[in-house]
Amino acid sequence: MDEGVNTYEQLRVEGRENPNAGLLKDLAKSKQAVSALGLENLPASALNQLPYQVMASRGLDQPVQGPTAGQYGKGNYGVIVYYKTAALLRYLAGYLGQEKFDDAMRAYYTKWQFRHPYPEDMEAVFEESTGQKLDWFFREMLTNTREYNADIFATQTIGDQVKVLVRTDSPVLWPVPVSTVDAQGKVLQTLWTPPFGNPEDDAESQLNFRKENVAAVVVDAEYLTPQLNRRDDRLALGDGNFRRWEPVRVQPLASVERWDRSAINWMPVIGANTSDKFMLGAAFYNGLLAPKSCSTWPCPCTASAGTSSTASPRST
C-alpha cells in the first residue's frame, strides 16, 4: 500500500497548484479533448478513476491488498497499486473528514516511521485515532473486487426538509456520499450514510437534507466511490416518470460515465460486399471505455451501388 499512499499524498500536493492533477492531467489541458470526451466540469477524482474503471468493467480488476507484484496483470500494477489505492484513500478521507484523516495519517507516521508496517497496522492506528471501526475498508474494500453500487430509492419533502432513502445492493458494508444539487448542478449539501449493506437483500439508509434550492439528489456527486455505473445516481425532486432522466449528448469515439448526463458515441465505419460494393456509414454505441453487460451497435451504411442502404446491428 505504500505506493498508493505516496500517490494519494502526491496528488493532494499537486492539486494545490493544478486542480486536474493526476494520471490524465495533460488530457485536461486540451480543450478539444475535454469537449470530445465530455469531460467538462469533471473533478480530477473522476479522471483518476477512469483507468481503474476501464479495467474493472472488463473483468480485469484486482484487489489493492493481497496479490504480489508479479501477480498483477499487464497494466494493472500501475493502475491498481498506485491509482486505485490513492482513489480509495481519497474516498476514506471523504467519509472520515479530511481533518480526521490527516490526524490519523500523522499518528500512523509517528508510530511506524523507519519501520515496515502492514495494512492491519495502518487499520489499528486509524481506528484508534478516529474511534471508528474501519474493517469494512481495510479488510473488505481493499481486499476484494466487488462492484459497489447505490441509488436514490425515494425522496419525500416535508416542511423545510428533504428525506432521502438511499439503497445499495452491496453484500458488504460501505458508506455512501449523497448530495443535493440545484438546477445548475451545483452541490448544496453533502451527507454520508453510515456503512451499510446486506448479503441477503438490498439495504437502505435514510438521510435528511435542507430543502432550500434543491432540484435533485445525487449519489457520489464528487466521484469519490468506486462505482462503475453512474446512470442511476441522480433523482430529481417532484413527481412523474422522468425523474431519473438525464440529458443525452451524441459524442464521437468515447465518453466517461457521468451522473449528470448520458452519452451516445459514434465512429465512422466502412464496409464492402459484392452486392452493394463500397459502403460508408457510422456506428452508434455506448460504454466503449466502460462496457455494459448489454450493448447494441447499430451501423447504418450507404452503399455506392444504387441508392439502397443497409444497417448492420451488433449486440453483445
What does each model-found stretch correspond to?
Residues 1-169, 173, 183-186, 217:
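Hydrophobic alpha-helical and helix-loop surface patches within well-folded domains
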Residues 130-132, 213, 289-290:
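Alpha-helix capping and inter-helical loop/turn segments
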Residues 162, 183, 196, 212-216, ...:
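Cleavable N-terminal export/targeting peptides
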Residues 170-173, 211-212, 275:
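Short proline/glycine-enriched turn/loop motifs at strand-loop junctions of beta-rich domains
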Residues 177-179:
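Beta-strand signatures of extracellular beta-sandwich domains
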Residues 188-198:
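Solvent-exposed serine/threonine-rich low-complexity stretches and specific carbohydrate-binding patches
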Residues 200-211:
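Exposed aromatic-hydrophobic patches
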Residues 207-209, 220-316:
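Outer-membrane beta-barrel initiation region
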